[in-house]
UniProtKB/Swiss-Prot annotation:
One of its GO terms (molecular function) is trans-2-decenoyl-acyl-carrier-protein isomerase activity. This is 3-hydroxydecanoyl-[acyl-carrier-protein] dehydratase. PANTHER family: 3-HYDROXYACYL-[ACYL-CARRIER-PROTEIN] DEHYDRATASE, 3-HYDROXYDECANOYL-[ACYL-CARRIER-PROTEIN] DEHYDRATASE. Necessary for the introduction of cis unsaturation into fatty acids. Catalyzes the dehydration of (3R)-3-hydroxydecanoyl-ACP to E-(2)-decenoyl-ACP and then its isomerization to Z-(3)-decenoyl-ACP. Can catalyze the dehydratase reaction for beta-hydroxyacyl-ACPs with saturated chain lengths up to 16:0, being most active on intermediate chain length. It comes from Mannheimia succiniciproducens (strain KCTC 0769BP / MBEL55E). Belongs to the thioester dehydratase family. FabA subfamily. Pathway: Lipid metabolism; fatty acid biosynthesis. GO terms for biological process: unsaturated fatty acid biosynthetic process. It catalyses: a (3R)-hydroxyacyl-[ACP] = a (2E)-enoyl-[ACP] + H2O; (3R)-hydroxydecanoyl-[ACP] = (2E)-decenoyl-[ACP] + H2O; (2E)-decenoyl-[ACP] = (3Z)-decenoyl-[ACP]. Its EC number is 4.2.1.59, 5.3.3.14. The gene is fabA. Keywords: Cytoplasm, Fatty acid biosynthesis, Fatty acid metabolism, Isomerase, Lipid biosynthesis, Lipid metabolism, Lyase. Pfam families: FabA. One of its GO terms (cellular component) is cytoplasm.
Length: 177
């Protein structure tokens, strides 16, 4: 486990910070990485803490600015552009993994599952901003590093996706996964 005091542990992160995470520079050489663009599904993290959220065990809030030229609008679907729902789900997993690195967890992050996902709206190229909110329910930070969280995706003020029991683990040895 990395000493969180040696990390660049802040309560918010810019796009440049997130790019540094994708290169493995933010949480140290053994810390988890975010994916690089175009799979990086957020532009900034605006709030992180270890005691907030619906369960008092941690909270992450991030934003994605919607631009009509985002890669998925050109192919999903031609003539009927919509952000794939799986990308919103992946963004929530990305943020759980980011949180695990933020608290000092080490290893390569992998999504391990989700309890239930509900879609009640869509993200169109006319939207302006997506907000992701992650409410940590349980964090294991020992030899096994794992986070369990609930999440939601909001577009322009309306919650359109919810997910329960988002599970992400950090692995030291990928041969066991």
């Amino acid at each position: 486990m990395t000493d969180s005091c040696t990390l660049n542990k802040k309560s918010s992160y810019t796009y440049e910070d997130l790019l540094a995470s994708s290169r493995g520079e933010l949480f140290g050489p053994k810390g988890p990485q975010l994916p690089a663009p175009t799979m990086l599904m957020m532009d900034r993290v605006i709030e992180m803490n270890e005691t907030g959220g619906n369960y008092g065990k941690g909270y992450v809030e991030a934003e994605l600015d919607i631009k009509p030229d985002l890669f998925f609008f050109g192919c999903h679907f031609i003539g009927d552009p919509v952000m794939p729902g799986c990308l919103g789900l992946d963004a929530m997993w990305q943020l759980v993994g980011f949180y695990l690195g933020w608290i000092g967890g080490e290893g390569k992050g992998r999504a391990l599952g989700v309890g239930e996902v509900k879609f009640t709206g869509q993200i169109l190229p006319t939207a302006k901003k997506v907000i992701y909110r992650i409410h940590l329910k349980r964090v294991i930070n020992r030899k096994l590093v794992m986070g369990l969280a609930d999440g939601e995706v909001e577009v322009d003020g309306r919650v359109i996706y919810t997910a329960t029991d988002l599970k992400v683990g950090l692995f030291q040895d990928m041969s066991t996964f």
